[in-house]
A protein has these predicted regions:
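Short alpha-helical transmembrane segments in multi-pass integral membrane proteins
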Residues: 18-38, 47-48, 91, 95, ...
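Interfacial segments at transmembrane-helix termini and the short loops linking adjacent helices
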Residues: 20, 36-66
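Short runs within selected transmembrane alpha-helices of multi-pass transporters and secretion channels
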Residues: 56-106, 112-134, 179-184
Length: 213
């Protein structure tokens, strides 16, 4: 809606600002979610299903969280700018890419991981085409900020793994939940350290602002 309003008023600077903010928020949420699910796939499987056998499916499905988020956010941007047909066309291309990937990857060699990556390819192709379209309309994103988010999420993932290993003697459920909490806390701490969020932006987060004076 914010992009649509700015587009109606022909305020391109505001459109670019809103688009950059939306992309940053999307990555702030979906990148650590994907990393966390990837590194804790087997413990999560054990926690939810009582077996680690679903860990492979969970791990290889993890990138879909981020890729789907990018697809949805960029689709909203294009629609807000009045280009309603482009996201649909890009989505159709993504579906075709998925069908090709399913034929190539869904076999005995790749197993369920192949099916998961076919879905990742679907979302990834659509998101990439949307981003290319946005660039053609002079919408730019701060890739440096996104790179910092990825770096913070990577460190967070390492913290999650280490925490789970250290708590390996506890019950699997307790170790997994504690690892998730440690990962979440470390990620929040890392964001300002990596220069992703400043103090003013942190104050806008309901959970964090109560700890900041």
């Amino acid at each position: 809606p914010a992009v649509s309003e700015a587009f109606a008023l022909n305020k391109w600077q505001i459109i670019e600002q809103k688009a950059a903010t939306a992309m940053k928020l999307c990555c702030l949420i979906t990148v650590p979610a994907s990393v966390g699910m990837w590194v804790l796939a087997e413990p999560i499987s054990l926690l939810l299903y009582g077996t680690a056998k679903a860990g492979v499916a969970i791990m290889h499905s993890a990138p879909a969280i981020c890729l789907l988020g990018l697809q949805q956010v960029t689709t909203g941007m294009l629609q807000g700018m009045g280009h309603t047909n482009l996201p649909m066309l890009n989505m159709l291309i993504g579906i075709v890419a998925k069908l090709v990937a399913v034929c190539q990857l869904t076999n005995a060699e790749y197993g369920i991981a192949g099916a998961a990556w076919a879905t990742n390819i679907n979302f990834g192709v659509t998101a990439l085409l949307n981003i290319i379209a946005l660039y053609k309309f002079s919408i730019r994103f701060s890739w440096l900020s996104i790179a910092k988010i990825i770096a913070a999420a990577a460190v967070m993932g390492a913290v999650a793994v280490e925490a789970h290993v250290l708590l390996g003697g506890a019950s699997p459920a307790l170790a997994t939940i504690a690892a998730m909490l440690a990962a979440g806390i470390s990620y929040i701490v890392l964001l300002p350290l990596f220069g992703v969020l400043n103090r003013q932006e942190l104050r806008q987060l309901p959970v964090v602002k109560r700890f900041l004076k």
